[in-house]
Amino acid sequence: MSENNTSRKTRTGSVVSDRMEKSVVVRVERKVRHKLYGKFMKTSVKYLADDPENQCNIGDVVLIEECRPLSKRKRWRVKTILEQAV
Protein backbone atom coordinates (compact mmCIF):
# COMPACT_ATOMS: atom_id res chain seq x y z
CA MET A 1 0.00 0.00 0.00
CA SER A 2 2.50 2.64 1.07
CA GLU A 3 5.92 2.89 -0.51
CA ASN A 4 9.03 2.87 1.64
CA ASN A 5 10.32 6.45 1.41
CA THR A 6 14.09 6.41 1.98
CA SER A 7 14.82 10.10 1.44
CA ARG A 8 16.15 11.39 4.75
CA LYS A 9 17.58 14.74 5.74
CA THR A 10 21.36 14.99 5.49
CA ARG A 11 23.81 17.56 6.83
CA THR A 12 27.54 18.11 6.36
CA GLY A 13 29.62 19.34 9.27
CA SER A 14 32.79 18.98 11.27
CA VAL A 15 33.28 16.86 14.38
CA VAL A 16 33.73 19.04 17.46
CA SER A 17 33.83 16.38 20.19
CA ASP A 18 34.39 12.61 20.24
CA ARG A 19 34.75 12.06 23.98
CA MET A 20 31.59 9.96 24.29
CA GLU A 21 31.34 6.26 23.60
CA LYS A 22 29.77 5.64 20.14
CA SER A 23 28.69 9.30 19.82
CA VAL A 24 30.11 12.47 18.30
CA VAL A 25 29.10 16.13 18.32
CA VAL A 26 28.90 17.60 14.81
CA ARG A 27 28.80 21.37 14.16
CA VAL A 28 26.89 22.32 11.01
CA GLU A 29 27.44 25.88 9.79
CA ARG A 30 25.22 27.77 7.38
CA LYS A 31 24.90 31.32 6.14
CA VAL A 32 21.74 33.27 6.93
CA ARG A 33 20.84 36.62 5.43
CA HIS A 34 19.79 39.38 7.83
CA LYS A 35 16.23 40.50 7.05
CA LEU A 36 16.76 44.24 7.32
CA TYR A 37 20.38 44.82 6.38
CA GLY A 38 20.95 41.95 3.95
CA LYS A 39 24.31 40.99 5.44
CA PHE A 40 25.14 37.28 5.48
CA MET A 41 25.94 35.88 8.92
CA LYS A 42 27.27 32.48 9.91
CA THR A 43 25.11 30.45 12.25
CA SER A 44 25.88 27.00 13.56
CA VAL A 45 23.96 24.15 15.14
CA LYS A 46 25.45 21.24 17.08
CA TYR A 47 23.99 17.78 16.50
CA LEU A 48 24.65 14.63 18.51
CA ALA A 49 25.29 11.81 16.03
CA ASP A 50 25.68 8.06 16.43
CA ASP A 51 29.12 6.65 15.54
CA PRO A 52 28.85 2.89 16.21
CA GLU A 53 32.46 2.00 15.24
CA ASN A 54 34.08 5.05 16.92
CA GLN A 55 35.78 6.00 13.64
CA CYS A 56 35.41 9.79 13.85
CA ASN A 57 38.05 12.09 15.31
CA ILE A 58 37.97 15.80 16.12
CA GLY A 59 38.25 17.87 12.94
CA ASP A 60 36.81 15.26 10.55
CA VAL A 61 34.25 16.46 8.01
CA VAL A 62 31.32 14.03 8.06
CA LEU A 63 27.96 13.49 6.39
CA ILE A 64 25.18 12.76 8.89
CA GLU A 65 21.65 11.60 8.14
CA GLU A 66 18.47 11.72 10.15
CA CYS A 67 17.24 8.52 11.81
CA ARG A 68 14.85 7.37 14.50
CA PRO A 69 15.48 8.64 18.05
CA LEU A 70 18.40 6.67 19.50
CA SER A 71 18.46 8.45 22.87
CA LYS A 72 17.19 11.64 24.48
CA ARG A 73 19.27 13.94 22.21
CA LYS A 74 20.57 11.63 19.43
CA ARG A 75 18.54 11.69 16.21
CA TRP A 76 21.36 11.61 13.63
CA ARG A 77 23.76 8.90 12.41
CA VAL A 78 27.18 9.32 10.78
CA LYS A 79 26.82 8.11 7.20
CA THR A 80 30.31 8.72 5.79
CA ILE A 81 33.54 10.48 6.68
CA LEU A 82 34.18 12.90 3.83
CA GLU A 83 37.54 14.26 4.98
CA GLN A 84 39.91 12.95 7.64
CA ALA A 85 41.63 15.39 10.00
CA VAL A 86 45.41 15.48 9.96
UniProtKB/Swiss-Prot annotation:
Keywords: Ribonucleoprotein, Ribosomal protein, RNA-binding, rRNA-binding. Disulfide bonds: none annotated. One of its GO terms (cellular component) is cytosolic small ribosomal subunit. PROSITE patterns: RIBOSOMAL_S17 (PS00056). One of its GO terms (biological process) is translation. One of its GO terms (molecular function) is rRNA binding. CDD domains: Ribosomal_uS17 (cd00364). One of the primary rRNA binding proteins, it binds specifically to the 5'-end of 16S ribosomal RNA. Belongs to the universal ribosomal protein uS17 family. Part of the 30S ribosomal subunit. This is Small ribosomal subunit protein uS17.
